[in-house]
Amino acid sequence: MSSTMSADQSNRARPVIRIKENPEDFTVEEVADIPKSDNGKYTIIKAEIIDWDTNRIVEEIASALRISRKRISYAGTKDKRARKIQYFCINAPVDVSVLAFKGFRIIDRFRSDHYLRLGDLTANHFRIRFQGASDDYIEQRYEKMMECGGFPNYFGQQRFGSRRRNTHDVGRLIVTGRYEDAVRLYLYDERYDIEDYRREFIETLDYNRALEKFPRTLRFERSIIGYYAQHHTFKGAFDALPKNLSIMFVHAYQSYLFNRMLSLRIEKYGLNRAIPGDTAFPVDRYFNPDKSRPVEVNEVNVDTINQLIERDRLRVALPIIGSEVGPDQSDFGEIEKKILEEEHVDRSMFRNSEYPHLSSTGDRRIVSAKPVDFSVSNSVMDFTLGRGIYATTLISTFGDLVDFDAESDGF
């Protein structure tokens, strides 16, 4: 085992596991079944992308093809500091061979009548080089984790931002109707930001100076400053961002609420125990839930449900609170309600009549998962996870994670 330990970790024997010291150390490849059609309406490209944020690469593709970014879709967002094999769908008659820039390479291209949407994946395959722990240690922790029924399906830390881990805090302000405060926190958060130009703009609102000082790489922040220059108010400033980016703040806050609920759920009932009033879903081998077939747990079927959970046929799913998804009817639902009371929010607040694109209906997320085809050799972990399940969350069960993906892109 590595001797890389923090002082208070030595007694717990949890190593500090470091990943992404180089982007090529973290490879994620989308597993998708996209039907091909010679005369299909859409162009699908499969690309290798290194050290690009998903939203920024979409902007680059759109710019190179001279089309709106709205004509480009993808199945999943990925970490910036990584090597990604990712699919994109282009709804325009364009020549994709012109796409040539650093860190981007087309592996395959074909036509399809299938329009690619977020979540149109079977799984993600990961190959991750790590430091700070031995292969034997990782193997032992993996076996223990599998014996315990898998790992908690928390949203990963990147959901809440990279260096500036405040995306959910901005989302909380949006949900509670404090739009101007939300914009201010996005532009400058004293907990994380040391750049004078951020602080100076919030203090002076001198947008001309801010547009001179804010680096052009911070294009989303600059878009908001440009909005303020035109309207002299922060209210409505999130309209200056692409809609899929502005809703990320709300989704991050929902993820924060889910993680709080899951943590208390494990503390009270353990990882995989179903109780009457729960909702469970059938899962496939990658732990993708079939949400079209919910199973309501009651006093009669609870023992059978727990047996099916042990056999990895079912998983309990907690609510991702939204306008159409509220706390459960189980005993644990009372704890879920208490969390919302502490946050001073309720489900109705996720329906935003003033800015409908910042509304979220909510969802459900399974409480645990397992990696598929896991192996470790020469300080490289190799495994596959279902869609929306975070590799960083899995690795965090093995040790205290240090993720070098610390580039600030505002999210």
Curated annotation (Swiss-Prot):
Its EC number is 5.4.99.27. The active site is at D79 (nucleophile). The keyword Isomerase applies. GO terms for biological process: tRNA pseudouridine synthesis. It catalyses: uridine(13) in tRNA = pseudouridine(13) in tRNA. Could be responsible for synthesis of pseudouridine from uracil-13 in transfer RNAs. This is Probable tRNA pseudouridine synthase D. It comes from Thermoplasma acidophilum (strain ATCC 25905 / DSM 1728 / JCM 9062 / NBRC 15155 / AMRC-C165). The gene is truD.
